[in-house]
């Protein structure tokens, strides 16, 4: 990911917590700015708000003038609970969004979701009455049943760091298939602008997920399948192909997220 301009001072984030519908404590960080809207980032599976890729994204967004918040999905980072692969996580996003609306001057929120965070963003917009301005979805999951990773033992080190083993998420293995919400079903209820970004032949979540979501979604919508070498997934794209993804993100946010 490209770095923010040296002249821009990024403030230390303020941390907050909310209590979700079932008593689960959810943590988030806020990088404040005087913008009339908020960008709320939902990391993907095995990522939390303190991961370098998420911190770098917050700095990039803040340098562009966006008030930015990043949350720990349940079962990740400091948040309590266990991760259910889009079972109850949308309640957590709703709780964070409502707290931010109550404690700031913002009038709208753009959700940026990575991987399973993209699915959760879709379900949040579909199932809760929030002033959502737009959805920016990077390598989003359409349906758990569609996940078929293509693992190459010769290149897997490019995608998964050994340090991941030290920060394992807590998973709700008992969540049945029927309890996992299919984002491809919820997307039809979302009327705000939507942007889908995916690397062609993503090794973990095939770009067919974004295609399926795009085809089911209503206008306004846009789909960008990046034909770049490496089959990279989610936030890793910012590290290896920032020149390809950052202009797409900036253009979409400039059109739909006031600052």
Explain the meaning of each model-derived region.
Residues 190, 196-198, 202:
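Short beta-strand/loop motif that positions the catalytic acidic residue
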Residues 58-80:
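Conserved alpha/beta-hydrolase
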Residues 126-176:
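Hydrolase active-site cap/lid region
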Residues 203-209:
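Conserved alpha/beta-hydrolase "acid-adjacent" motif
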Residues 2-32:
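N-terminal cap/lid segment of alpha/beta-hydrolase-fold proteins
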Residues 74-104:
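Catalytic nucleophile-loop/oxyanion-hole region of alpha/beta-hydrolase
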Residues 229-243:
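Catalytic histidine-centered segment of alpha/beta-hydrolase-like enzymes
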Residues 46-59:
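The serine-hydrolase catalytic nucleophile loop
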């Amino acid at each position: 990911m490209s770095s923010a301009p040296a002249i821009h001072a990024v403030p230390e984030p303020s941390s907050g917590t909310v209590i979700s519908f079932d008593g689960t404590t959810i943590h988030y960080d806020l990088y404040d700015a005087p913008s009339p809207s908020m960008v709320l980032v939902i990391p993907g599976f095995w990522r939390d708000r303190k991961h370098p890729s998420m911190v770098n994204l917050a700095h990039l967004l803040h340098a562009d003038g966006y008030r930015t918040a990043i949350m720990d999905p349940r079962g990740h980072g400091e948040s309590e609970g266990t991760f259910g692969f889009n079972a109850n996580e949308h309640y957590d996003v709703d709780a964070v969004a409502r707290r931010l609306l109550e404690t700031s001057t913002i009038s709208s929120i753009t959700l940026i979701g990575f991987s399973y965070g993209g699915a959760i963003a879709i379900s949040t917009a579909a199932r809760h009455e929030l002033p959502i301005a737009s959805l920016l979805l990077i390598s989003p999951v359409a349906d758990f049943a569609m996940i078929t990773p293509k693992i190459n033992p010769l290149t897997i080190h490019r995608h998964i760091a050994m340090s991941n083993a030290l920060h394992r998420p807590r998973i709700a293995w008992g969540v049945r298939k029927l309890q996992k919400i299919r984002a491809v079903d919820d997307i039809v209820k979302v009327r705000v602008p939507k942007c889908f970004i995916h690397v062609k032949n993503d090794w973990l979540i095939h770009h067919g997920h974004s295609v399926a979501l795009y085809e089911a979604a209503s206008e306004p919508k846009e789909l960008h399948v990046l034909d770049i070498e490496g089959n990279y997934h989610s936030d890793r794209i910012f590290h290896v192909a920032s020149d390809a993804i950052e202009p797409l993100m900036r253009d979409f946010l400039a059109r739909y997220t006031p600052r």
